[in-house]
Every structure is written in C-alpha cells, then in structure tokens.
Regions:
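Central helical "cap/lid" subdomain
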Residues: 10-11, 20-81, 143
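Catalytic metal-binding/acid-base residues of hydrolase active sites
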Residues: 5-6, 37, 195
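Conserved flavin/dinucleotide-binding core of flavoenzymes
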Residues: 15-17, 25-26, 65, 80-223
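A conserved short coil-to-beta-strand element within the FAD-binding core of flavoproteins
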Residues: 2-16
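Short, well-ordered beta-to-alpha junction loops that form the rim of enzyme active sites
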Residues: 3-5, 21-22, 114
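Short, structured coil/loop segments at alpha-helix boundaries
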Residues: 3, 47-52, 174, 185
Length: 223
C-alpha cells in the first residue's frame, strides 16, 4: 500500500499489526526500515514500547545532517573527474568539500555541508544556495564558470527522514547498533543504516542491514 504513512505498530502473541491511515495490516512479523530520525521523533507508536535496549540505542545514537548540493555549470572548467577539493575559508566548515562528477554526468560538481549549516541550506532557496556557494566555486574552478542550476537535498525537512546519517554521539557506540539489530520477540526486526555494525552510516550498510533482517525473519518463518 502506497501513500499511507505508518502511525502505529502493535506486537501481539502471534502477530504484528501495522496501522496506516484508516487501515490495518496484520502478519506474523514485520521489518521496520524507517530512518533513525523517524524513530527518534516518535512518529510511529509501538505497542508495547520498544524494549529498553532498543530504546536506549534509538535515543543514544546521534542522527546528523550532511546536505548535498549539486551544481550544474554551462561547461566543465576542470580537467580531473572524480576529484576531491578541500576548501579552507574564513568561515570554518562552510563549503569545505567539493567533488567533480564523472564526465558522463555532465558539468556537475557536488558540495557537502554538515551540521547547522547543512540544516540551514536545506531550508534555503536555490537562489540563496547559489549566491553563497558561487564565490567559492569560482576560487576552485575558475572565474569563468557559469552556473545553470543547483539542487540541494532536503533530508532534514523531510518528515520521513528527519536527517541524513547516524553517528556515535557521546555515550553511544557499536553496542547500540548491535542491540538495534536484535529481533524483538521474534516478531519485529529493525533495519537501516543505523542498525548493525557492518558499514554503518552508509547506503551499503542500510542494504546489508536489510538483508540481515530478512534472513533472520526467513529463518524464523522456516523454523
């Protein structure tokens, strides 16, 4: 079922009931793959609540911001593709990382911004993003670059993400990720980039986590 945000997940002795809008779905188990930011927000109610270890993991791990801005220029003014540029300016951390994309993608470069700066950019207009970045881009790629458009991620203002990647906040660590990977009453399984210790905080880690959860569930159902 599409376009039906899940609002509640209930565990019962022999099933799991997932509620979305005005409908409910019941099955022997469920895999929950929402981002850590959604779990932290409480947008989904768990009945009964998640076990203490899982709740601690959700609360202890950080969920940060790493915005991506893709800039398309009228032509390539750089010679090396897949190159990394580090910019050190008077505003520490501002537009500090740039990457040139493969030539097949066109004259496009990618820039990262983290933390509060990334959060602010994701709420900014393309015009304002371009105005702030262009002076730095010209220092890196030449004064004659001509911008065409920019597209910036909006993970922080997306209610189905609420951030970008998990990280180890003070007091948290790999044990919290391991705990999140533990099945809950053999009925509920969590998966995602924050779950497990195999390449966490990456897309690869999210895929591996999902496969692991699916394997756990298949093993249980086949037993």
């Amino acid at each position: 079922m599409l376009n039906a945000p899940v609002t509640a997940i209930a565990r019962r002795d022999s099933s799991v009931i997932v509620r979305a809008k005005d409908r409910s779905f019941e099955g022997p188990a469920a895999i929950v793959t929402v981002p850590l930011g959604v779990l932290k927000s409480g947008a989904i109610t768990f009945d009964p609540p998640l076990p203490d270890g899982h709740t601690r993991g959700v609360n202890a791990l950080g969920f940060g911001v790493l915005s991506k801005s893709y800039f398309r220029f009228s032509r390539r003014t750089w010679d090396v593709e897949n190159a990394i540029y580090q910019f050190l300016g008077t505003d520490p951390g501002a537009w500090s990382q740039w990457f040139t994309l493969p030539s097949a993608a066109g004259p496009i470069v990618l820039a990262f911004n983290a933390g509060d700066r990334g959060r602010s950019l994701e709420s900014s207009s393309p015009k304002d993003v371009m105005a702030g970045a262009l002076p730095i881009a010209r220092q890196l790629f030449g004064d004659d670059i001509s911008p065409v458009e920019v597209a910036t991620s909006t993970w922080t203002i997306d209610p189905y993400a609420r951030g970008a990647y998990s990280f180890h906040a003070p007091g948290s660590g790999l044990d919290d990720r391991r705990q999140l990977q533990e099945p809950i009453s053999d009925r509920l399984y969590l998966a995602g980039e924050a779950v497990g210790v195999n390449n966490p905080a990456t897309v690869t880690g999210a895929v591996l986590s999902g496969r692991y959860a699916a394997g756990q569930l298949m093993h249980r159902l086949s037993g």
